[in-house]
């Protein structure tokens, strides 16, 4: 049974009437452009064929009822007429409540909803299961009540909910690609203007995601430290964001900066340039150049931004040794564990899978999880 069938069946069973709509919003993987989003820079993600699915129907009152199929059918119920506050014990509820609360501040021309939620975006892997949930919930209200909100506004609403209600700092990329993703394409997103340009993916290329299964521990505190270091760098150049600083300007005065801040700034500036070039390489079907850019990105994250761990570096080395110059591989996501992403010809997938299976656990003591994905469509009815 797929997620649509599962949520529709559960909806009818629990609520006693059929759902009127089923909405999906995908997870994502970022091909290149890491820690550039909160510096107003560029990112190049694609939506993947793992998603959050919600079967839903409008109610004729002001109550929102939610069933989480993946959490033993836990229930949350709240009123649109009372202040929406955080749930004490169900963390998943806060993503739903946060989205609805912030939606009310944007456009409160909506009533109650019944919904059943299920998803298959791996959690804790850096593939944006939370953004996928936020965008799916926002799209439910937009579709059921014909709210005049576009994908970018639904994405911004999800980001606000995560930053302000759930209390987790994040850039806009995850929600934006979940809302705006395009089948068989990546999106070059300008995180300042939220402009997105569809970049076609070469035919016969697989998007492979390998989870290191190294438990991320430092990610919150270190993420915030990196943000502060980037802000310090922008202040040094008297610019609103590092987006506005050129590599030439940086190189001229790099020695005057705190050495650690200088390394962080150099990563962001070089990564921005790599990301724009990567979009053009992908469009031309130049997988060799894309692979070089991904390798440079990984080295920069490892040496300048210092967000990789030995397990991730090992995984990258195993994949790189297998694919040579026929594709690319790098860490993807916030860092300190999580996943690597590889762009490789489909005929190389079995060899990569085998090499990783034979070597990664032997070298690290951890078993990886291997996903082969397709660039997929953003949020909407399914």
Swiss-Prot record:
Among InterPro entries, the record links this protein to: Galactokinase, Galactokinase_bac, Galactokinase_CS, GalKase_N, GHMP_kinase_C_dom, GHMP_kinase_C_sf, GHMP_kinase_N_dom, GHMP_knse_ATP-bd_CS
Which residues does ATP bind? 124-130
Residues marked Transition state stabilizer (site)? 28
SUPFAM superfamilies annotated for this entry? Answer: GHMP Kinase, C-terminal domain, Ribosomal protein S5 domain 2-like
Q: What is its EC number?
A: 2.7.1.6
**Pfam families recorded for this chain?**
GalKase_gal_bdg, GHMP_kinases_C, GHMP_kinases_N
Localization:
Cytoplasm
Establish whether keyword ATP-binding is in the entry: yes
Where in the sequence is the active site?
174
Binding of substrate, residues: 34-37, 223
Alphabetic keyword roster: ATP-binding, Carbohydrate metabolism, Cytoplasm, Galactose metabolism, Kinase, Magnesium, Metal-binding, Nucleotide-binding, Transferase
* One Gene Ontology molecular-function label: galactokinase activity
Its UniProt entry gives the catalysed reaction(s) as: alpha-D-galactose + ATP = alpha-D-galactose 1-phosphate + ADP + H(+)
Looking up PROSITE patterns in the UniProt record yields: GALACTOKINASE, GHMP_KINASES_ATP
Q: Which GO terms describe its biological process?
A: galactose metabolic process
Enumerate the residues binding Mg(2+).
130, 162
Q: In what pathway does it function?
A: Carbohydrate metabolism; galactose metabolism
Superkingdom in the source lineage: Bacteria
Instruction: Tell whether Magnesium is among the UniProt keywords.
Output: yes
Transmembrane region(s): none
Q: What does this protein do?
A: Catalyzes the transfer of the gamma-phosphate of ATP to D-galactose to form alpha-D-galactose-1-phosphate (Gal-1-P).
Q: Which family does it belong to?
A: Belongs to the GHMP kinase family. GalK subfamily.
Q: Which NCBIfam families match?
A: gal_kin, PRK05101.1
Name of protein: Galactokinase
The organism's lineage is: Bacteria, Pseudomonadati, Pseudomonadota, Gammaproteobacteria, Enterobacterales
């Amino acid at each position: 049974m797929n997620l649509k069938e599962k949520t529709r069946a559960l909806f009818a069973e629990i609520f006693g009437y059929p759902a009127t709509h089923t909405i999906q919003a995908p997870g994502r993987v970022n091909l290149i452009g890491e820690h550039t989003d909160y510096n107003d820079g560029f990112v190049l993600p694609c939506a993947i064929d793992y998603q959050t699915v919600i079967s839903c129907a409008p109610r004729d009152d002001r109550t929102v009822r939610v069933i989480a199929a993946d959490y033993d059918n836990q229930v949350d119920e709240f009123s649109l007429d009372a202040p929406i506050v955080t749930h004490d014990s169900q963390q998943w509820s806060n993503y739903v409540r946060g989205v609805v609360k912030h939606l009310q501040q944007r456009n409160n021309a909506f009533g109650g909803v019944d919904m059943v939620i299920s998803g298959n975006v791996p959690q804790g892997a850096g593939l944006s299961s939370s953004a996928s949930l936020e965008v799916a919930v926002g799209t439910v209200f937009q579709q059921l009540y014909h709210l005049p909100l576009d994908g970018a506004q639904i994405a911004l609403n999800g980001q606000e909910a995560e930053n302000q209600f759930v209390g987790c700092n994040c850039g806009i990329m995850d929600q934006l690609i979940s809302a705006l993703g395009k089948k068989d394409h990546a999106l070059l997103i300008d995180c300042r203007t939220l402009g997105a340009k569809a970049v076609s993916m070469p035919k016969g290329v697989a998007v492979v995601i390998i989870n290191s299964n190294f438990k991320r521990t430092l990610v919150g505190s270190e993420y915030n430290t990196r943000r502060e270091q980037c802000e310090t760098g922008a202040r040094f150049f008297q610019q609103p964001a590092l987006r506005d600083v050129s590599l030439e300007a940086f190189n001229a005065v790099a020695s005057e900066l705190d050495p650690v801040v200088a390394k962080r700034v150099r990563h962001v500036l070089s990564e921005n340039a790599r990301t724009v070039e990567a979009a053009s390489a992908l469009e031309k079907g130049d997988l060799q150049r894309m692979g070089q850019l991904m390798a440079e990105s990984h080295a920069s994250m490892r040496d300048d931004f210092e967000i990789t761990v030995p397990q991730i570096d090992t995984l990258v080395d195993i994949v790189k040794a297998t694919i040579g110059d026929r594709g690319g591989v790098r860490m993807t996501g916030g860092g300190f564990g999580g996943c690597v992403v590889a762009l490789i010809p489909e005929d190389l997938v079995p060899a990569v899978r085998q090499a990783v299976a034979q070597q990664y656990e032997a070298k690290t003591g951890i078993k990886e999880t291997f996903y082969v994905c397709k660039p997929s469509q953003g949020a909407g009815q399914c």
